[in-house]
Protein backbone atom coordinates (compact mmCIF):
# COMPACT_ATOMS: atom_id res chain seq x y z
CA UNK A 1 0.00 0.00 0.00
CA UNK A 2 1.23 3.49 -0.87
CA UNK A 3 0.24 6.86 0.57
CA UNK A 4 0.99 10.12 -1.23
CA UNK A 5 0.28 13.63 -0.06
CA UNK A 6 -1.30 15.48 -2.97
CA UNK A 7 -1.02 19.27 -2.87
CA UNK A 8 -2.72 21.82 -5.09
CA UNK A 9 -0.90 24.93 -3.79
CA UNK A 10 -1.85 24.93 -0.08
CA UNK A 11 -4.73 22.47 -0.53
CA UNK A 12 -3.37 19.07 0.47
CA UNK A 13 -4.92 15.64 1.01
CA UNK A 14 -3.75 12.07 1.48
CA UNK A 15 -4.19 9.59 -1.37
CA UNK A 16 -3.87 5.98 -0.17
CA UNK A 17 -3.82 3.24 -2.81
CA UNK A 18 -3.11 -0.48 -2.78
CA UNK A 19 -4.74 -3.80 -1.96
CA UNK A 20 -7.42 -3.72 0.78
CA UNK A 21 -6.77 -0.04 1.47
CA UNK A 22 -10.39 0.49 2.55
CA UNK A 23 -9.76 -1.75 5.52
CA UNK A 24 -7.34 0.91 6.78
CA UNK A 25 -9.56 4.01 6.68
CA UNK A 26 -9.56 4.12 10.49
CA UNK A 27 -5.83 4.84 10.43
CA UNK A 28 -6.36 7.89 8.20
CA UNK A 29 -9.58 9.46 9.46
CA UNK A 30 -9.98 10.34 13.17
CA UNK A 31 -13.08 8.72 14.67
CA UNK A 32 -14.55 12.07 15.71
CA UNK A 33 -13.81 13.86 12.40
CA UNK A 34 -17.34 13.44 10.98
CA UNK A 35 -20.69 12.64 12.55
CA UNK A 36 -21.99 10.69 9.53
CA UNK A 37 -21.07 9.64 6.01
CA UNK A 38 -23.37 10.09 3.03
CA UNK A 39 -22.13 7.53 0.51
CA UNK A 40 -23.06 8.43 -3.08
CA UNK A 41 -22.80 5.92 -5.90
CA UNK A 42 -24.31 5.50 -9.36
CA UNK A 43 -26.30 2.43 -10.37
CA UNK A 44 -23.42 1.01 -12.38
CA UNK A 45 -21.30 0.38 -9.28
CA UNK A 46 -21.82 -3.17 -7.93
CA UNK A 47 -23.70 -3.34 -4.62
CA UNK A 48 -20.94 -5.54 -3.20
CA UNK A 49 -18.37 -2.75 -3.60
CA UNK A 50 -20.63 -0.09 -2.09
CA UNK A 51 -21.43 -2.24 0.94
CA UNK A 52 -17.77 -3.22 1.32
CA UNK A 53 -16.84 0.47 1.53
CA UNK A 54 -19.76 1.18 3.87
CA UNK A 55 -18.60 -1.58 6.22
CA UNK A 56 -15.31 0.15 6.97
CA UNK A 57 -16.55 3.74 7.01
CA UNK A 58 -19.31 2.48 9.30
CA UNK A 59 -16.71 1.73 11.96
CA UNK A 60 -16.14 5.47 12.24
CA UNK A 61 -19.68 6.89 12.09
CA UNK A 62 -23.14 6.02 10.70
CA UNK A 63 -23.28 5.54 6.91
CA UNK A 64 -26.22 6.34 4.62
CA UNK A 65 -26.13 5.12 1.02
CA UNK A 66 -27.64 7.17 -1.81
CA UNK A 67 -27.76 5.74 -5.34
CA UNK A 68 -28.55 7.53 -8.60
CA UNK A 69 -29.02 6.39 -12.18
CA UNK A 70 -25.76 5.87 -14.06
CA UNK A 71 -24.98 7.35 -17.47
CA UNK A 72 -23.66 10.68 -18.76
CA UNK A 73 -27.23 11.84 -19.35
CA UNK A 74 -27.72 11.80 -15.55
CA UNK A 75 -24.58 13.81 -14.81
CA UNK A 76 -26.69 16.93 -14.31
CA UNK A 77 -27.61 19.60 -11.81
CA UNK A 78 -31.02 17.98 -11.33
CA UNK A 79 -29.30 14.78 -10.19
CA UNK A 80 -27.13 16.81 -7.82
CA UNK A 81 -30.16 18.62 -6.37
CA UNK A 82 -32.03 15.36 -5.86
CA UNK A 83 -29.09 13.88 -3.95
CA UNK A 84 -28.71 17.01 -1.83
CA UNK A 85 -32.40 16.96 -0.88
CA UNK A 86 -32.12 13.31 0.13
CA UNK A 87 -28.95 14.02 2.12
CA UNK A 88 -30.62 16.88 4.00
CA UNK A 89 -33.57 14.59 4.78
CA UNK A 90 -31.08 12.18 6.36
CA UNK A 91 -29.79 14.93 8.64
CA UNK A 92 -26.72 16.06 6.72
CA UNK A 93 -24.93 19.02 8.31
CA UNK A 94 -21.54 20.73 8.26
CA UNK A 95 -19.91 17.75 10.00
CA UNK A 96 -21.15 15.31 7.36
CA UNK A 97 -18.75 13.87 4.80
CA UNK A 98 -19.81 12.98 1.27
CA UNK A 99 -18.13 9.75 0.12
CA UNK A 100 -18.07 9.21 -3.65
CA UNK A 101 -17.89 5.48 -4.38
CA UNK A 102 -17.60 4.94 -8.12
CA UNK A 103 -15.94 6.18 -11.28
CA UNK A 104 -15.60 9.65 -12.72
CA UNK A 105 -19.36 10.08 -13.09
CA UNK A 106 -19.99 9.49 -9.40
CA UNK A 107 -16.93 11.51 -8.42
CA UNK A 108 -18.10 14.60 -10.29
CA UNK A 109 -21.73 14.40 -9.20
CA UNK A 110 -20.76 13.84 -5.56
CA UNK A 111 -18.05 16.50 -5.82
CA UNK A 112 -20.51 19.13 -7.02
CA UNK A 113 -22.99 18.07 -4.32
CA UNK A 114 -20.36 18.34 -1.57
CA UNK A 115 -19.01 21.67 -2.79
CA UNK A 116 -22.45 23.26 -2.81
CA UNK A 117 -23.95 21.93 0.43
CA UNK A 118 -23.55 24.42 3.28
CA UNK A 119 -21.09 26.19 0.94
CA UNK A 120 -18.82 23.16 1.13
CA UNK A 121 -18.65 19.99 3.23
CA UNK A 122 -15.98 17.28 3.27
CA UNK A 123 -15.54 15.18 0.14
CA UNK A 124 -13.91 11.73 0.16
CA UNK A 125 -13.22 9.83 -3.05
CA UNK A 126 -13.28 6.03 -3.26
CA UNK A 127 -12.62 5.49 -6.98
CA UNK A 128 -13.76 2.07 -8.20
CA UNK A 129 -12.42 2.36 -11.76
CA UNK A 130 -8.81 2.62 -12.83
CA UNK A 131 -9.72 5.70 -14.89
CA UNK A 132 -11.00 7.53 -11.83
CA UNK A 133 -8.14 6.37 -9.60
CA UNK A 134 -5.43 7.37 -12.06
CA UNK A 135 -6.96 10.50 -13.55
CA UNK A 136 -10.15 12.20 -12.40
CA UNK A 137 -9.43 12.19 -8.64
CA UNK A 138 -6.06 13.81 -9.40
CA UNK A 139 -7.80 17.11 -10.04
CA UNK A 140 -9.91 19.50 -8.01
CA UNK A 141 -12.25 20.12 -10.95
CA UNK A 142 -15.86 19.16 -10.20
CA UNK A 143 -18.44 19.55 -12.95
CA UNK A 144 -21.66 18.28 -14.49
CA UNK A 145 -23.04 18.41 -18.01
CA UNK A 146 -25.53 20.55 -19.88
CA UNK A 147 -27.42 19.26 -22.91
CA UNK A 148 -25.00 21.22 -25.10
CA UNK A 149 -21.79 19.71 -23.75
CA UNK A 150 -19.72 17.96 -21.08
CA UNK A 151 -18.55 19.56 -17.85
CA UNK A 152 -19.92 23.02 -18.65
CA UNK A 153 -21.12 23.76 -15.08
CA UNK A 154 -18.84 23.36 -12.09
CA UNK A 155 -16.09 24.68 -9.87
CA UNK A 156 -12.83 23.73 -8.15
CA UNK A 157 -13.17 21.78 -4.91
CA UNK A 158 -10.55 19.47 -3.37
CA UNK A 159 -11.31 16.22 -1.54
CA UNK A 160 -10.18 15.58 2.03
CA UNK A 161 -9.08 11.98 1.36
CA UNK A 162 -8.82 9.51 -1.52
CA UNK A 163 -8.77 5.71 -1.08
CA UNK A 164 -8.20 3.48 -4.13
CA UNK A 165 -8.34 -0.28 -3.56
CA UNK A 166 -6.29 -1.87 -6.34
CA UNK A 167 -7.85 -5.28 -5.65
CA UNK A 168 -11.21 -3.83 -6.69
CA UNK A 169 -9.63 -2.13 -9.70
CA UNK A 170 -7.91 -5.34 -10.83
CA UNK A 171 -11.24 -7.18 -10.82
CA UNK A 172 -12.87 -4.60 -13.11
CA UNK A 173 -13.91 -5.61 -16.65
CA UNK A 174 -10.93 -5.29 -19.05
CA UNK A 175 -12.70 -2.66 -21.14
CA UNK A 176 -13.10 -0.52 -18.03
CA UNK A 177 -9.40 -0.93 -17.21
CA UNK A 178 -8.55 -0.02 -20.81
CA UNK A 179 -10.40 3.27 -20.39
CA UNK A 180 -7.97 4.24 -17.65
CA UNK A 181 -4.97 2.95 -19.57
CA UNK A 182 -5.86 5.37 -22.38
CA UNK A 183 -5.34 8.27 -19.98
CA UNK A 184 -2.08 6.67 -18.77
CA UNK A 185 -0.88 6.51 -22.39
CA UNK A 186 -1.91 10.16 -22.76
CA UNK A 187 0.44 11.02 -19.88
CA UNK A 188 3.21 9.06 -21.63
CA UNK A 189 2.61 11.04 -24.83
CA UNK A 190 2.36 14.55 -23.40
CA UNK A 191 5.21 14.53 -20.87
CA UNK A 192 8.80 13.36 -20.65
CA UNK A 193 8.70 10.14 -18.61
CA UNK A 194 12.25 9.35 -17.58
CA UNK A 195 11.39 8.15 -14.07
CA UNK A 196 8.49 5.76 -14.59
CA UNK A 197 8.75 2.36 -12.84
CA UNK A 198 7.48 0.33 -15.79
CA UNK A 199 8.23 -0.08 -19.49
CA UNK A 200 6.06 -0.27 -22.57
CA UNK A 201 6.50 -4.06 -22.41
CA UNK A 202 4.44 -4.07 -19.21
CA UNK A 203 1.40 -2.88 -21.18
CA UNK A 204 -0.93 -5.47 -22.70
CA UNK A 205 -3.93 -5.42 -25.02
CA UNK A 206 -5.91 -7.78 -22.76
CA UNK A 207 -5.86 -5.08 -20.05
CA UNK A 208 -5.47 -7.59 -17.26
CA UNK A 209 -3.13 -6.37 -14.52
CA UNK A 210 -2.31 -7.36 -10.96
CA UNK A 211 -3.13 -5.07 -8.03
CA UNK A 212 0.59 -4.33 -7.67
CA UNK A 213 0.91 -3.35 -11.35
CA UNK A 214 -2.07 -1.00 -11.02
CA UNK A 215 -0.48 0.51 -7.91
CA UNK A 216 2.64 1.23 -9.98
CA UNK A 217 0.54 2.77 -12.77
CA UNK A 218 -1.35 5.00 -10.31
CA UNK A 219 1.93 6.13 -8.80
CA UNK A 220 3.16 7.12 -12.27
CA UNK A 221 -0.03 9.06 -13.02
CA UNK A 222 0.23 10.90 -9.71
CA UNK A 223 3.82 11.92 -10.49
CA UNK A 224 2.89 12.95 -14.03
CA UNK A 225 -0.09 15.07 -13.07
CA UNK A 226 1.36 16.65 -9.96
CA UNK A 227 4.56 17.63 -11.78
CA UNK A 228 2.34 20.17 -13.52
CA UNK A 229 -0.78 20.71 -11.40
CA UNK A 230 1.01 21.49 -8.14
CA UNK A 231 1.72 24.91 -9.68
CA UNK A 232 -1.38 25.22 -11.87
CA UNK A 233 -4.20 24.09 -9.63
CA UNK A 234 -6.94 25.45 -11.89
CA UNK A 235 -5.52 23.75 -15.00
CA UNK A 236 -5.72 26.92 -17.09
CA UNK A 237 -2.05 27.27 -18.08
CA UNK A 238 0.41 24.37 -18.19
CA UNK A 239 -2.28 22.10 -16.79
CA UNK A 240 -4.24 22.41 -20.02
CA UNK A 241 -1.91 19.77 -21.45
CA UNK A 242 -3.97 17.10 -19.67
CA UNK A 243 -6.83 18.03 -21.98
CA UNK A 244 -4.88 16.51 -24.88
CA UNK A 245 -7.25 14.45 -27.00
CA UNK A 246 -10.26 15.74 -25.08
CA UNK A 247 -11.50 18.45 -27.46
CA UNK A 248 -12.54 15.98 -30.14
CA UNK A 249 -12.72 13.09 -27.65
CA UNK A 250 -15.46 14.67 -25.54
CA UNK A 251 -17.44 15.49 -28.69
CA UNK A 252 -17.18 11.85 -29.83
CA UNK A 253 -18.20 10.62 -26.38
CA UNK A 254 -21.33 12.78 -26.42
CA UNK A 255 -22.21 11.96 -30.02
CA UNK A 256 -21.93 8.23 -29.30
CA UNK A 257 -24.45 8.60 -26.44
CA UNK A 258 -22.81 6.07 -24.14
CA UNK A 259 -21.75 3.63 -26.85
CA UNK A 260 -18.04 3.99 -26.08
CA UNK A 261 -16.05 4.62 -22.92
CA UNK A 262 -14.41 7.92 -22.04
CA UNK A 263 -10.99 6.36 -22.55
CA UNK A 264 -11.86 5.04 -26.00
CA UNK A 265 -13.13 8.48 -27.00
CA UNK A 266 -9.94 10.13 -25.75
CA UNK A 267 -7.81 7.56 -27.62
CA UNK A 268 -9.55 8.48 -30.87
CA UNK A 269 -9.27 12.17 -29.97
CA UNK A 270 -5.50 11.82 -29.50
CA UNK A 271 -5.08 10.12 -32.89
CA UNK A 272 -7.07 12.91 -34.55
CA UNK A 273 -5.05 15.56 -32.69
CA UNK A 274 -1.79 13.93 -33.84
CA UNK A 275 -2.98 13.80 -37.45
CA UNK A 276 -4.06 17.46 -37.28
CA UNK A 277 -0.67 18.48 -35.84
CA UNK A 278 1.05 16.55 -38.63
CA UNK A 279 -1.05 18.31 -41.31
CA UNK A 280 -0.10 21.64 -39.74
CA UNK A 281 3.60 20.69 -39.95
CA UNK A 282 3.89 20.66 -36.17
CA UNK A 283 4.39 16.93 -35.58
CA UNK A 284 6.63 14.60 -37.60
CA UNK A 285 5.18 11.38 -38.99
CA UNK A 286 7.17 9.13 -36.65
CA UNK A 287 5.51 10.75 -33.63
CA UNK A 288 2.08 10.13 -35.17
CA UNK A 289 3.16 6.49 -35.51
CA UNK A 290 4.17 6.50 -31.83
CA UNK A 291 0.57 7.40 -30.95
CA UNK A 292 -0.72 4.39 -32.90
CA UNK A 293 1.95 2.10 -31.44
CA UNK A 294 1.30 2.98 -27.79
CA UNK A 295 -2.48 2.93 -28.11
CA UNK A 296 -2.36 -0.40 -29.92
CA UNK A 297 -0.20 -1.79 -27.09
CA UNK A 298 -3.26 -1.48 -24.84
CA UNK A 299 -5.76 -2.45 -27.54
CA UNK A 300 -7.31 1.01 -27.44
CA UNK A 301 -8.04 1.25 -31.17
CA UNK A 302 -9.39 -2.26 -31.64
CA UNK A 303 -13.10 -2.73 -32.27
CA UNK A 304 -14.23 0.72 -31.14
CA UNK A 305 -17.93 0.76 -32.06
CA UNK A 306 -18.04 4.26 -33.57
CA UNK A 307 -21.48 4.95 -35.03
CA UNK A 308 -21.89 8.73 -34.99
CA UNK A 309 -21.46 10.75 -38.16
CA UNK A 310 -18.92 13.61 -38.43
CA UNK A 311 -21.63 16.29 -38.38
CA UNK A 312 -23.00 15.15 -35.02
CA UNK A 313 -19.46 15.05 -33.59
CA UNK A 314 -18.83 18.58 -34.85
CA UNK A 315 -22.10 19.77 -33.31
CA UNK A 316 -20.72 18.97 -29.85
CA UNK A 317 -17.20 20.05 -30.74
CA UNK A 318 -18.13 23.71 -31.12
CA UNK A 319 -19.38 23.72 -27.49
CA UNK A 320 -16.03 22.56 -26.07
CA UNK A 321 -15.50 23.85 -22.54
CA UNK A 322 -12.11 25.40 -23.40
CA UNK A 323 -13.73 28.07 -25.57
CA UNK A 324 -12.75 31.58 -24.51
CA UNK A 325 -9.21 30.86 -23.32
CA UNK A 326 -7.87 32.50 -26.48
CA UNK A 327 -9.52 34.86 -28.95
CA UNK A 328 -10.48 33.06 -32.17
CA UNK A 329 -12.40 33.90 -35.29
CA UNK A 330 -15.37 31.78 -36.33
CA UNK A 331 -13.25 29.70 -38.72
CA UNK A 332 -10.97 28.31 -36.01
CA UNK A 333 -11.18 26.20 -32.88
CA UNK A 334 -8.58 26.03 -30.10
CA UNK A 335 -6.96 22.62 -29.57
CA UNK A 336 -4.22 21.16 -27.39
CA UNK A 337 -1.58 19.82 -29.80
CA UNK A 338 1.90 18.32 -29.58
CA UNK A 339 4.92 19.08 -31.73
CA UNK A 340 6.27 15.66 -30.78
CA UNK A 341 6.02 13.06 -28.04
CA UNK A 342 6.60 14.88 -24.76
CA UNK A 343 6.61 18.26 -26.52
CA UNK A 344 3.48 20.41 -26.13
CA UNK A 345 2.89 22.83 -29.01
CA UNK A 346 2.83 26.49 -27.98
CA UNK A 347 0.93 29.37 -29.57
CA UNK A 348 1.43 32.92 -28.28
CA UNK A 349 2.63 31.49 -24.94
CA UNK A 350 -0.45 29.30 -24.51
CA UNK A 351 -1.11 25.59 -25.04
CA UNK A 352 -4.16 26.24 -27.22
CA UNK A 353 -3.43 26.33 -30.94
CA UNK A 354 -5.98 27.73 -33.43
CA UNK A 355 -7.01 24.98 -35.86
CA UNK A 356 -9.13 25.51 -38.95
CA UNK A 357 -12.53 23.90 -38.52
CA UNK A 358 -12.33 22.62 -42.09
CA UNK A 359 -9.16 20.67 -41.19
CA UNK A 360 -10.81 19.19 -38.10
CA UNK A 361 -13.80 18.07 -40.16
CA UNK A 362 -11.49 16.60 -42.79
CA UNK A 363 -9.59 14.49 -40.24
CA UNK A 364 -12.77 13.32 -38.51
CA UNK A 365 -14.25 12.24 -41.85
CA UNK A 366 -11.11 10.24 -42.66
CA UNK A 367 -11.41 8.30 -39.41
CA UNK A 368 -8.68 6.24 -37.80
Swiss-Prot record:
Show the InterPro entries listed in the entry: Dehydroquinate_synthase (IPR050071), DHQ_synth_fam (IPR030963), DHQS/DOIS_N (IPR030960), DHQS_C (IPR056179)
Short name of any one Pfam family annotated for the protein: DHQ_synthase
> Catalysed reaction per UniProt?
D-glucose 6-phosphate = 2-deoxy-L-scyllo-inosose + phosphate
Q: Which family does it belong to?
A: Belongs to the sugar phosphate cyclases superfamily. DOI synthase family.
Keyword set, alphabetical order = Antibiotic biosynthesis, Cobalt, Lyase, Metal-binding, NAD
Function in brief:
Catalyzes the intramolecular carbocycle formation from D-glucose-6-phosphate to 2-deoxy-scyllo-inosose (DOI).
The identity of this protein, by name, is 2-deoxy-scyllo-inosose synthase
